[in-house]
Each structure stands twice: as structure tokens, then as C-alpha cells.
Amino acid sequence: MNTLNVKLSHSISQLYETLCQVGKSTFADLQRATNFKDTELCLALCSLMHDNKVYQARISNTVYYIIK
């Protein structure tokens, strides 16, 4: 596994743990909690959504990410 895949895998795990702790969160909330840059957070969120671990919901014009 190359370095990029290892880093992304670690980011995905860290993001999942963060979401489990804080519950539903906005993109900005997750950035503050993880200190991820936009691209890193997007890739980790996409991976978790692809694996059906997280879903995206619009509540009162705000997009939230929520553990399934």
C-alpha cells in the first residue's frame, strides 16, 4: 500500500471516530474537529458514504453528515 493510501485510510478512520463521538456534523464542524483540509475531508467523507457508513442530509438548508 502506498503512502497516500495509508494516509487516506488513517483519515477515514479518524473521521469515522470523530463522527461517532460528535454525532451529526456540518462540513465546517468536521474540519474544526479533525483539522483536515478540504480535499482530505472530502475524500474521507466520500469513502464513508460509498461504504454506507455515513449519509448526507439537508436539514433547514444546512447539510449534515450523520452515522448510519
List the predicted regions and their residue ranges.
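Short alpha-helical segments that sit at the start of domains
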Residues: 1-15, 42, 62-64, 68
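Long, compositionally biased intrinsically disordered regions
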Residues: 1-3, 29-34, 60
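Alpha-helix N-cap/helix-initiation sites
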Residues: 5-8, 23, 38, 56
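Short amphipathic alpha-helical interface segments
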Residues: 8-34
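Aromatic side chains
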Residues: 16, 27, 55, 64-65
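Residue-level detection of the helix-turn-helix DNA-binding "recognition helix"
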Residues: 20, 46, 50
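Short amphipathic alpha-helical interaction segments
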Residues: 36-47
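A short, conserved structural fragment
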Residues: 49-59
